[in-house]
A protein has these predicted regions:
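Active-site loop segments of alpha/beta catalytic cores
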Residues: 1-242
Length: 242
């Protein structure tokens, strides 16, 4: 921890140039969301064995606190560089402290550190998009306390445990929901009719109560048929009106 190199001026300039090029390409056809190395807990999972990490906040809370401070602070300069370079949103990985931990554990031991990082992002005028692609339902209410403007991707069963209609009712418009078409069993392996049916079902569930953005539940799988993606987009556009 003590001797980790700091972000260099050269890295900062490289970020500015890459974001400039991407935004120039995008023009008015989209926004640019950039990833950082996760929230504090996700970041810690890259340097600490997961089995140890999941017990650390109970077995050695003092060290856990130091670790979370370290994984927060090491990310701040990079996060600021992305925002100052023009990123429209910051995507924050939060899948490692997933729903299997339960709301009580998450809120007591994880949420305070994640919230501090989320606050840092949003105090600079950039919305934070919190990402949990695994079990999520037990934490849907907890994420209201997290303060992120957006939460995604609400992976449906069997990829995760999200039931979008239930989640929308819990959130009640307190944050934007992004989700949640099954990118494996529907977009990659499904028929056009299955894509249409699932898209309509997800769209209707999502826009029932509060702001909603439809997308695949996670990144597209390799060899996803282009015609399935086109059908997903066109069906979503036809059914997007509230």
């Amino acid at each position: 921890m003590k001797y980790e190199p700091v972000m260099t001026p050269e890295y900062n300039e490289m970020v500015k140039e890459k974001i400039r090029r991407v935004k120039e390409y995008l023009g008015n056809n989209g926004i640019l969301g950039t990833w950082v190395p996760g929230g504090p807990f996700n970041n810690a999972s890259m340097i600490i064995n997961h089995s140890d990490l999941y017990m650390l906040f109970m077995n050695d809370p003092e060290y856990f606190d130091l670790l979370m401070q370290f994984t927060t602070n090491r990310t701040l300069p990079y996060t600021k560089a992305f925002i100052e370079a023009g990123a429209d949103a910051m995507l924050v990985g939060g899948n490692v402290p997933g729903g299997f931990l339960g709301a009580d554990i998450y809120e007591q031991f994880i949420l305070p550190y994640e919230k501090k990082y989320i606050d840092f992002i949003q105090e600079q005028g950039c919305p934070a998009v919190y990402h949990n692609c695994g079990q999520i339902m037990s934490l849907v209410g907890s994420y209201k306390k997290l303060g992120a403007r957006v939460v995604e991707p609400f992976s449906p069963i069997p990829l995760g445990d999200a039931i979008l209609a239930d989640a929308v009712g819990i959130v009640n418009g307190d944050y934007v929901i992004i989700g949640g078409i099954d990118q494996v069993n529907v977009l990659q392996k499904g028929t056009l009719e299955q894509v249409r049916k699932s898209t309509i079902e997800i769209m209707e569930a999502g826009k029932r109560n509060g702001p909603f953005i439809i997308q695949s539940a996670d990144f597209l799988e390799y060899n996803t048929p282009l015609e399935n993606v086109e059908e997903f987009i066109s069906t979503a556009m036809r059914n997007a009106a509230y």
